[in-house]
Amino acid sequence: TRDFNFVKDTCRGFLAIARAEGVEGEEINIASGTEVTMKQTLMKIAEIMDADINWVVDPERIRPSKSEVFRLCGDNTKIETLTDWRPEWSLEEGLRATVDWFRNPDNLAKYKYNVYNR
């Protein structure tokens, strides 16, 4: 499982930490606090895009078990205690906003797939 943040929530978290008093040197998570599997994420994207997909696992892409963190979910307790930050975007809202962004031809023309996907 993973814990995904929408980028606007992450940026708001950075700003909240930067503005907070007495947090220098603190390790502070910015997380949604919600676990989701990769399959659930893919199925939600397919639903948003109204796409019919087949789930295929490529054995070449499976990481060795000793190199993988199988469950990853952030704890927001510290950021919520030290700042007024709370996540505002659900996973579905963030995915919908992302899909909508990519559906806009003007945005897609600016997307540098050869730079971002190395």
What is the role of each PLM region?
Residues 2, 7-8, 12, 16-29, ...:
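Glycine/proline-rich active-site loop of Rossmann-fold NAD(P)-dependent oxidoreductases
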Residues 7, 62-86, 96-97:
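Conserved C-terminal active-site "lid" loop/helix of NAD(P)H-dependent oxidoreductases
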Residues 10, 14, 30, 41, ...:
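Non-catalytic, hydrophobic alpha-helical segments
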